[in-house]
């Protein structure tokens, strides 16, 4: 079984920002045990900024990007050094992998990351992964390690993603506010209500709250990966989950997941523009799985070229799909609203009948934006 484990800042650190070495040691011991029983494990770890805070004895997380990046530069080396020390005690080898959004949005780099991680796992190495917080800016930032873990789980075709946090799972209400809140044990479908329940609350030391974890679960759901949210401080939590015991909240994957290529289009590819389409075209795409023809395009935004990823927006201005475009933005501007047989007359040539072929088109349920 291939497992991706994500552990958050709130689990790895104390309230004062310093690393909880006891928790880290227990986590490493559990992962080492999983390796001993034949499982493959990728570890996505937060904590670099928290480790930097502890090193400098800072009590509050700075808000400016340069300060956060400086703390990450201090903390990342410390974090990996501690992990390596603990894993060495169990005879396990680790490899540090720092990623940015471009490693996912660029198809060639995306595949290269896949090959690298596959080799590491084949050799029995534990890849320890974090976003490269020291150099990333908003334009190339993934944003949170929940999303990073989900993208990686899809990339390595994991069987399960386990997100360890400081609460026991997804509740029907915020358990920090409502004592009567009940845990949701299993989620099979995604709805607006589920995202409302998740809210947007995080912790002082973490980046994302439950909302980012639901977004991560959505990526896993489409990718055919089971995801579990559990409390990282439960004794032997990873081994209990690997043994099939019910802990936390389990998000079951869709029965017919989309292809790995379409997962890349939906969640990883950089969006270079937007196509606004009419109601008829939206219905044809969503209800009947049709390709997008130029006749259904009302407006185009952005500067994109052939093969770029664009967002498809319906008449209610909701993003309903993403796809790889067959024509440039200049060409689409000329042929929008036209019939297929008119393309050659207008442009002087015709590449395809479709603006986006259905094989390169991914429907986004709930009309929600994923990535950017």
UniProtKB/Swiss-Prot annotation:
Gene3D superfamilies reported in the protein's UniProt record: Acetylglutamate kinase-like (3.40.1160.10), PUA domain (2.30.130.10)
Name of the protein: Glutamate 5-kinase
Pathway in which this enzyme or protein is active: Amino-acid biosynthesis; L-proline biosynthesis; L-glutamate 5-semialdehyde from L-glutamate: step 1/2
UniProt lineage: Bacteria, Bacillati, Bacillota, Clostridia, Thermoanaerobacterales
Nucleotide-binding found in the keyword field: yes
Locations listed in the record: Cytoplasm
Binding positions for substrate per the UniProt entry: 46, 133, 145
Name of the encoding gene: proB
One GO CC annotation: cytosol
The keyword Amino-acid biosynthesis is assigned to this record: yes
Reaction(s) catalysed by this chain's protein: L-glutamate + ATP = L-glutamyl 5-phosphate + ADP
């Amino acid at each position: 079984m291939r497992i991706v484990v994500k552990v958050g800042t709130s689990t790895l650190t104390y309230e004062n920002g310093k690393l909880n070495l006891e928790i880290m040691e227990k986590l490493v011991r559990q992962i080492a045990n999983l390796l001993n029983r034949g499982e493959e494990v990728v570890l996505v770890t937060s904590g670099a900024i928290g480790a930097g805070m502890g090193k400098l004895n800072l009590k509050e997380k700075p808000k400016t990007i340069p300060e956060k990046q400086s703390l990450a530069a201090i903390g990342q080396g410390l974090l990996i050094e501690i992990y390596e020390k603990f894993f060495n005690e169990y005879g396990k080898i680790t490899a540090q992998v720092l990623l940015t959004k471009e490693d996912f949005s660029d198809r060639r780099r995306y595949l290269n990351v896949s090959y690298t991680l596959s080799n590491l796992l084949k050799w029995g190495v534990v890849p320890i992964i974090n976003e490269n917080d020291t150099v990333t800016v908003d334009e190339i930032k993934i944003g949170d390690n929940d999303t990073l873990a989900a993208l990686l789980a899809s990339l390595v075709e994991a069987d399960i993603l386990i997100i360890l946090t400081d609460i026991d799972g997804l509740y029907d209400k915020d358990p920090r506010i409502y004592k009567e809140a009940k845990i949701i044990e299993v989620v099979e479908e995604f709805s607006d209500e589920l995202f409302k329940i998740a809210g947007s609350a995080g912790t002082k030391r973490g980046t994302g709250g439950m909302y980012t974890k639901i977004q991560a679960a959505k990526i896993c759901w489409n990718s055919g990966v089971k995801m579990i949210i559990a409390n990282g401080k439960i004794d032997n939590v990873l081994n209990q989950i690997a043994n099939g015991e019910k802990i936390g909240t389990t998000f079951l994957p869709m029965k017919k997941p989309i292809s790995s290529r379409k997962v890349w289009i939906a969640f990883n590819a950089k969006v270079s523009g937007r196509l606004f389409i009419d109601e008829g075209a939206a219905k044809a795409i969503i209800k009947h799985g049709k390709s997008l023809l130029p006749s259904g395009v009302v407006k185009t935004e952005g500067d994109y070229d052939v093969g770029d990823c664009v967002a498809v927006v319906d008449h209610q201005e909701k993003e309903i799909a993403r796809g790889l475009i067959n024509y440039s933005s200049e060409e689409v501007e000329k042929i929008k609203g036209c019939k297929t047989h008119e393309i050659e007359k207008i442009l002087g040539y015709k590449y395809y009948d479709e603006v986006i072929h259905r094989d390169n088109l991914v429907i986004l349920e709930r009309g929600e934006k994923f990535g950017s």
